[in-house]
Amino acid sequence: MGSGCSSPSISLTTIATSHFQSQESLSNSLNFYSPTRFLEPHLLKSSKIFIPKSPLKCAKVPEMQTQLEDSAKPIVDPHDIDSKLVQKLANDALVWCPLRGLLVGDRNSERSGTIPGVDMVHAPVALIPMSFPESHWKQACEVAPIFNELVDRVSQDGEFLQQSLSRTRKADPFTSRLLEIHSKMLEINKLEEIRLGLHRSDYMLDEQTKLLLQIELNTISSSFPGLSCLVSELHRSLLQQYREDIASDPNRIPANNAVNQFAEALAKAWNEYGDPRAVIIFVVQAEERNMYDQHWLSASLRERHQVTTIRKTLAEIDALGELQQDGTLVVDGQAVAVIYFRAGYAPSDYHSESEWKARLLMEQSRAVKCPSISYHLAGSKKIQQELAKPNVLERFLENKDDIAKLRKCFAGLWSLDESDIVKDAIERPELYVMKPQREGGGNNIYGEDVRGALLKLQKEGTGSDAAYILMQRIFPKISHSILMREGISHKEETISELGIYGTYLRNKTEVLINQQAGYLMRTKVSSSDEGGVAAGFAVLDSIYLV
């Protein structure tokens, strides 16, 4: 979660927020989990993969189907739930989580991130889903395939990536190393004939403008496809059990099948690679308390698609990996069909040259990368800012309606060489967020720190400003929620961020998959600027459509 709320909504006079006419109303019937799907939701038999007729065809998000006339009413305000009921909800959730696998490693245990099954605790969760407007839910789902296609097209424009990041390269060593690998692939004309994207586009709903605005588009290590599904099921279970007390309809929580849709895309890419003996390798961190989210995906691949997965760190891949003459990547004696990154997105993942050697080795191979180096760069903050400039989307997309739908989601984004914006940010820092080229929580700069950072960069005058962008600060509605972490629940004033997953796969002749693929809802205390769950700022949540 990248943009916090510390004051009532404030509009930016420097931002043009154009409204576009809505498209035709969307057709009927969302797919919801039925009661019969409750026991083993992640490992149900796969349905046929949806193959769109056109790469840019938007997913149609249908109307809700419920049996209750009053089902569109907002869920009860958690602030009004008495303490006895809160305790019942918490106790039932504490039993449900270990039974269903809604778990993370205990941050107080040294072994919890390295040894599976040891020192587990429930994932941090909200006990009641967050109300969310159905119209904005549909909007976010509808643009997911367009963003998928945009990432693919941007990734194929090496000149655009290199030029857009040229100043950033000089100011940010991490981006420079990524661009170095990208340049080497361009020099040898390395073509990715099979391209796989597992993305997540994160949004906040601005309270004053009522616009759904994009925080960022993640193209590497889009986390929580496994646990997010379980939170939706937990909330449906609790609302069903306490339906009379809470007076809500569990069917207003939309189906969330992200983990199986991720598995479908990975399995289809594995199949396209064409070697039934090859494996999918998960590139992971040496210590990973969120390993169970990853293991849910491995389980879905094994149970639904009979695909074997292995887990290796970048250092292990350097030590055990080799590239055969035909481009086959072999790690620890096993041929690799697909490389799925759950690490490698931050400088802290590269402890030495060993990790960089592993990244280059994988990029040189003919294995399908998720993401490739070009997909990784296409998701950088600087590229997000470049795409928000006038007439840049037109370089990659032809359909005017698609372009309008994406622009409607864009918040204000600026480089630090725009002097008028920098001046305004120094005068009114509360209206901006300063973002470095980093993934994961805890990196952004807020409030008075924005002014201090900008003045420092101006004084230094070394070009270090190219390592950052400025973004409009979004001020979402403050809502009440009940948050539970480490067995302790408490009511809080909170804000939320919606992430929409997308899956994209194409070979050299056609797009095989391009669709919205579930969601992630994260909720945090409204006074907190940052919002990553794994970083300890937020909890997992689900949405209740109103």
UniProtKB/Swiss-Prot annotation:
Its EC number is 6.3.2.3. It is an enzyme of class 6 (ligase). ATP binds at residues 216, 381, 435-444, 446, 471-474, 497, 524, 530. Its cofactor is Mg(2+). It catalyses: gamma-L-glutamyl-L-cysteine + glycine + ATP = glutathione + ADP + phosphate + H(+). GO terms for molecular function: ATP binding; glutathione binding; glutathione synthase activity; magnesium ion binding; protein homodimerization activity. Substrate binds at residues 200, 220-223, 288-290, 294, 342-345, 522, 533-534. Mg(2+) binds at residues 216, 218, 439. Its main location: plastid. Binds 1 Mg(2+) ion per subunit. Keywords: ATP-binding, Chloroplast, Glutathione biosynthesis, Ligase, Magnesium, Metal-binding, Nucleotide-binding, Plastid, Transit peptide. Gene3D superfamilies: 3.30.1490.50, 3.30.1490.80, ATP-grasp fold, B domain (3.30.470.20), Glutathione synthase, substrate-binding domain superfamily, eukaryotic (3.40.50.1760), Glutathione Synthetase, Chain A, domain 3 (1.10.1080.10). Pfam families: GSH_synth_ATP, GSH_synthase. It is found in: Plastid, Chloroplast. Residues 1-63 form a transit peptide. GO terms for cellular component: chloroplast; cytosol. The keyword NAD does not apply. Pathway: Sulfur metabolism; glutathione biosynthesis; glutathione from L-cysteine and L-glutamate: step 2/2. Homodimer. Belongs to the eukaryotic GSH synthase family. This is Glutathione synthetase, chloroplastic. It comes from Solanum lycopersicum.
